[in-house]
């Protein structure tokens, strides 16, 4: 069974405390509930969560939707985006099955990054490591006015921005859910992968595409 790995990188730094982190928790839960009602996603999508603040860690390893359990997210500390990219690169290398002459490996991972601030570590060394792993579509979300879209643009061409209120964050995760749904249908029905924002559902009004 070829899996569609999905990695969520979530900023849990101190500036996300209060409404934003609660909105992220709710958003992820709504996303999981929605995906569990999509037979194609249930069959192919596997989800992992990596959180980053003063350091970064994989909070949920790559897990099928039925077994996924929501971790407790606590907002504290600084913004180690570079470390998160290193953790992500390592997870992709160890968890995603590569295609060989004998076996068809997993589909290329989808990656969604959400951050509300400037990186406080050496993010470029993390980016260099990330560039050495094979991924599918990568979407970075700049939450609130403090996020640095110029940094995110160096990670991926697909950057969106939104406010950090409950409604906007909820809309983002609904859109992520729809995007995973479209991706899992595409690989299931036609054996092709989504290659960018233009093949995903149109973003809701709360999301602005950063050009």
List where the protein language model places each region.
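Mixed-charge (Asp/Glu-Lys/Arg
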Residues: 13, 31, 126-131, 192
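Short glycine-/polar-rich loops that comprise or flank the Walker A/P-loop
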Residues: 4, 107-108, 134-137, 156-157
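Short, flexible, mixed-charge acidic loops at enzyme active sites
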Residues: 59-67
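Short, well-ordered amphipathic alpha-helices
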Residues: 28-36, 87-97, 127
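Von Willebrand factor
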Residues: 1-60, 69-107, 110-114, 137-152, 162, 166-175
């Amino acid at each position: 069974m070829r899996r569609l790995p999905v990695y969520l990188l979530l900023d849990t730094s101190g500036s996300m405390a209060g409404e934003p982190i609660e909105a992220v928790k709710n958003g992820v839960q709504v996303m999981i509930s929605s995906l569990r009602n999509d037979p194609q996603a249930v069959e192919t999508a596997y989800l992992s969560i990596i959180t980053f603040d003063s350091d970064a860690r994989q909070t949920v390893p790559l897990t099928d939707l039925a077994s996924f359990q929501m971790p407790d997210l606590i907002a504290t500390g600084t913004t180690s985006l570079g470390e998160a990219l290193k953790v992500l690169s390592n997870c992709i290398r160890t968890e995603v099955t590569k295609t060989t002459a004998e076996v068809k490996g997993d589909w290329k991972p989808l990656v969604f990054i959400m951050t509300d601030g400037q990186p406080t570590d050496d993010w470029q060394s993390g980016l260099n490591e990330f560039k050495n792993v094979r991924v599918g579509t990568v979407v970075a979300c700049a939450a609130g006015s403090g996020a640095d879209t110029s940094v995110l643009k160096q990670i991926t061409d697909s950057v969106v921005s939104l406010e950090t209120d409950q409604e906007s964050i909820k809309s983002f995760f609904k859109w992520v859910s729809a995007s995973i749904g479209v991706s899992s249908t595409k690989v299931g029905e036609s054996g092709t992968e989504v290659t960018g924002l233009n093949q995903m559902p149109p973003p809701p009004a709360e999301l602005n595409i950063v050009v």
